[in-house]
A protein has these predicted regions:
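Phosphate/nucleotide-binding catalytic core
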Residues: 1-499
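Conserved helix-loop functional segments at active or binding sites
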Residues: 325, 365, 533, 563-567
């Protein structure tokens, strides 16, 4: 978040004061760049490990405050936006020798500590780009971590947005969903990698980070499923962009920039271009009380915090973020790679980091200014294709040719990454180990996304989506304990989720969403035929505004049809005349047991599921309960 004490800007005076400090920070940074006031003799790397908290049923567990209380003496842990997410800030390492394995060990040791704390709370932790078992109602404001900065961020984004957030993501399935807050962004968990960069190299290195974002992402995708829908290979990219989009439709038309962005052009002169552009394009969301006098600090030879600049930078979400920081009293610049997902294992994550770090250095050595070899729009389009398709796509490279992503990585990029790591004197054993993980994963086309999708497709042939997603999450947790790279994992099995209980399932998780509907004006003959064609017994009836107004059953339709067929009225019988008007309904966040009680008590064969606007979003039928019963019987065998 850039600073612990931030708040929403509520008055013009607050805004003006913050803007003043923002301008001072820009001028101070400019002075520092011109006078060479940055550390250049050391290059460090760093990482941020985000993870999810889940209960014994593998559903989100909003316990990060309790976790922080138990882990309070460990300064590396911090909270995230949602109560079911946390983060570890790894200690920066000098980019040399055994830096990668040291980082891996530190993250594993801290995750072990988190596992122990979680076990005392009756919960578990999992590394994944998007938690498969997330449900829409998990993103109510009740799950917002209760810190002022998070309330301020959501309030500021909502104020700029002025309306609900629509998700529209298409892959194998399609997701159309509306949410009333940007908390939906908390579905994303990532593994951010940092590389310290000398000021003189910053422009070239930043542009390189843009070029390699696509191939690095294509080899590391791990977020293919959201709300039970199979979407992009790295759905985080689309979800993050849409969840914090503060623009109105008019602003879309004016081509105003989204706050989550890959960028629109190459960097040309310095890091200042990025910061100035962000101030021009993006309104201030948060502010903080700035105490320091940046120019007095510069006069005394002390590196300033540039807190106003940090706060504003933290509310602009570039996939490659330009960062200013201080290490051991010296100012430095770094590039934060925000592209990579969390998981599938720490071993996989460090391998991804090694690949990216090696490419950053190796391509700089081999090509220098990459803008001479590739148009920016090509790099941006590559990134989009990698997000959607992962390894199943073709990418353009610096030679102007198009390659299958896997071939490009194996034949061209891994050798360059190897040279880059060697240049920084990283131990040969580490290079072989981590780049070997990337090579095997790519050759076998076994990314985290591949594993999740193959497991999901297999499991849903004999279980409902909810149980399949719980099994995938359970298997992920088990495999992470062994730290075995994902390309060696067996597909998930239903037995992995031993604590699965149907009584803990919510309606949203097992209802049928592919619901056939009709209108009141449709004739009985047509709807009867539709039910026969689709082999269904219930059809929801909607009015012209899409509101649920009735329910048609096969018995009612057949009875009306048979009675009417022998009569000679001129006007055909309509569904509105025979349907069950204003049928009993249920909410998506009700428990399975509640649905069963209603259907048993009233001898219903179907129960429409509606939202708070009485819009139909699904249907619970006897078939849903039969599927769950069948799975329970299989477990008893």
């Amino acid at each position: 978040m850039g600073a612990p004490k931030v708040k929403a800007t509520s008055t013009a005076k607050q805004l003006q004061a913050f803007e003043k400090h923002l301008l001072k920070d820009i001028h101070a940074l400019n002075k520092m760049l011109h006078e060479g006031m940055f550390e250049i003799d050391k290059i460090r790397i760093g990482a941020e490990q985000e993870f999810c908290l889940v209960d014994k049923y593998y559903k989100p567990a909003g316990k990060n405050i309790e976790m922080m209380q138990m882990l309070g003496k460990n300064p590396l842990f911090t909270t995230e936006l949602a109560k079911f997410n946390m983060e570890i800030n790894a200690t920066p390492q000098i980019f040399a020798k055994d830096c990668l394995s040291v980082m891996e060990k530190e993250i594993l040791d801290n995750l072990d500590e988190a596992h122990r704390a979680a076990a005392e709370l009756g919960i578990q932790i999992v590394l994944t780009g998007i938690l498969p078992t997330l449900r829409k109602f998990d993103f109510s404001m009740d799950n917002l971590t209760p810190y002022e900065r998070y309330y301020a961020l959501c309030a500021s984004i909502n104020k700029l947005r002025g309306k609900n957030y629509d998700l529209n993501i298409s892959g194998i399935d399609e997701l159309f969903s509306e949410h009333d807050s940007p908390l939906i962004e908390a579905a994303n968990t990532g593994f951010q990698v940092h590389l310290q960069v000398r000021p003189d190299d910053f422009v070239d290195m930043y542009n390189i980070s843009q070029v390699i974002a696509a191939p690095v992402l294509s080899s590391s995708t791990n977020s293919p499923i959201l709300f039970g829908k199979r979407l992009w290979k790295e759905t985080r990219i689309a979800l993050f962009a849409q969840s914090v989009d503060t623009r109105s439709y008019k602003e879309h038309a004016r081509e105003m920039s989204p706050r989550v962005t890959f960028g629109d052009h190459w960097l040309q002169k310095s890091i200042l271009e990025i910061y100035k552009e962000d101030i021009i394009k993006y309104r201030v969301l948060l502010n903080t009380e700035v105490q320091e006098n940046v120019f007095e600090k510069l006069k005394s030879g002390t590196a300033p915090d540039l807190m106003a600049l940090k706060v504003h930078n933290s509310t602009v979400y570039r996939w490659n973020r330009a960062c200013y920081g201080i290490s051991e009293g010296k100012a430095h610049l770094r590039i934060e790679n925000r592209v990579l997902p969390a998981g599938p294992t720490v071993k996989d994550e460090i391998a991804n980091a090694a690949f990216w770090l090696g490419l950053m250095v190796g391509i700089h050595k081999q090509y220098g200014d990459v803008t001479k070899y590739m148009e920016f729009d090509v790099a941006k389009n590559n990134f989009l294709k990698a997000s959607v398709h992962g390894l199943d796509t073709k990418l353009f490279w610096l030679d102007g040719k198009s390659y299958a992503a896997g071939d490009l990585i194996i034949k061209e990029l891994l050798p360059i990454a190897r040279k880059g790591l060697k240049q920084h004197k990283v131990d040969k054993e580490e290079i072989d180990d981590y780049l070997g993980v990337i090579e095997d994963r790519v050759r076998e086309v076994r990314t985290g996304s591949y594993w999740q999708l193959k497991s999901f497709n297999k499991l849903t042939k004999k279980a409902n989506k909810e149980e399949a997603l719980a099994a995938i999450t359970a298997a992920t947790i088990q495999n992470q304990k062994d730290n075995t790279p994902v390309h060696k994992w067996n597909l998930a099995e239903l037995g992995a989720n031993k604590d699965w209980k149907p009584s803990e399932i919510f309606v949203e998780e097992f209802m049928t969403t592919k619901v056939f509907t009709a209108t009141e004006e449709d004739i009985v003959a047509l709807v009867s035929e539709m039910m026969d064609w689709q082999k269904i017994r219930y059809v929801a009836i909607e009015n012209k505004k899409g509101k649920l107004v009735g329910l048609a059953t096969s018995r009612l339709m057949l009875r009306a049809y048979m009675k009417h067929i022998h009569q000679e009225e001129k006007m055909p019988l309509t569904v509105g005349e025979v349907m069950i008007s204003n049928p009993m309904t249920i909410r998506p966040d009700a428990k399975l047991t509640e649905a069963m009680e209603i259907m048993t008590k009233y001898q219903f064969g179907a129960l429409p599921v509606v939202d708070d606007k009485n819009q139909l979003i699904g249907m619970v039928t006897e078939a849903n309960f039969l599927a769950i019963t069948n799975n329970l019987l299989e477990k008893v065998k």
